[in-house]
Design a protein with these regions (language model features):
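Acidic/glycine-enriched edge-of-secondary-structure segments
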Residues: 1-14, 32-38
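A conditional alpha-helix N-cap/helix-loop micro-motif detector
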Residues: 12-13, 43, 92
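Short acidic active-site motifs
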Residues: 19
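Primarily the HKD phosphodiesterase
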Residues: 23-86
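HKD (HxKxxxxD) catalytic microenvironment of the phospholipase D
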Residues: 31, 90-136
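Generic domain-boundary/flexible-linker signal
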Residues: 42, 71-73, 113, 121, ...
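A short, polar/proline- and glycine-enriched secondary-structure boundary/capping micro-motif
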Residues: 44, 73-74, 121-125, 148-152
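Cysteine/selenocysteine-centered motifs that mediate thiol-based redox chemistry or coordinate metal-sulfur cofactors
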Residues: 137-152
Length: 152
């Protein structure tokens, strides 16, 4: 009668990054991050891990808004961060009006919720971690990125 649900956990703004960074460090093939905003401060914290992943040959894909969609200093911060991401070998995709906040790791684990992974600063947020290759691949197809990332 009831289907077995994939394993999931909930995090807030205080607990998310510890779990996320642990999953990043265990990545073996690919990390996809969707974050509409990219801020200097958060990038400084995540960049060492992303750089380490890139050196290990792990594909990094970031889907975000184009910097021109941001106002004021946010556009400059996004543009500079995008250049830095590209310099470490990340693929950066742009989606107009983008507002999804999620990450997919090795197509086996994903996070989804309200926290902007590449720009979070000080708001009250929630993120759900789901460990399911079936659901991770389903999410990737649903958001339309499969055609850009291909098989792993």
């Amino acid at each position: 009668m009831f289907r077995r649900f994939p394993q999931s956990s909930l995090y807030d703004q205080n607990t998310f990054y510890r779990a996320f960074e642990r999953d990043l460090l265990h990545a073996r093939q690919e990390v996809i991050i969707e974050s509409p905003f990219i801020a200097e401060r958060r990038m400084e914290l995540l960049l060492p891990i992303l750089r380490k992943l890139s050196r290990r040959g792990i594909r990094i894909v970031v889907n975000t808004r184009h910097p021109d969609e941001h106002e004021g200093d946010y556009g400059r911060q996004a543009a500079e961060a995008i250049v830095t991401l590209q310099d470490i070998g990340a693929t950066v995709l742009y989606t107009g009006g983008h507002h999804r906040k999620l990450a997919i790791i090795d197509r086996k684990v994903f996070y989804e919720g309200s926290l902007n992974i590449l720009s979070y600063r000080d708001s009250c947020e929630i993120m759900r971690r789901v460990a399911s290759s079936v659901e991770a691949k389903r999410l990737l197809r649903f958001i339309g990125l499969m055609k850009y990332v291909g098989p792993i």
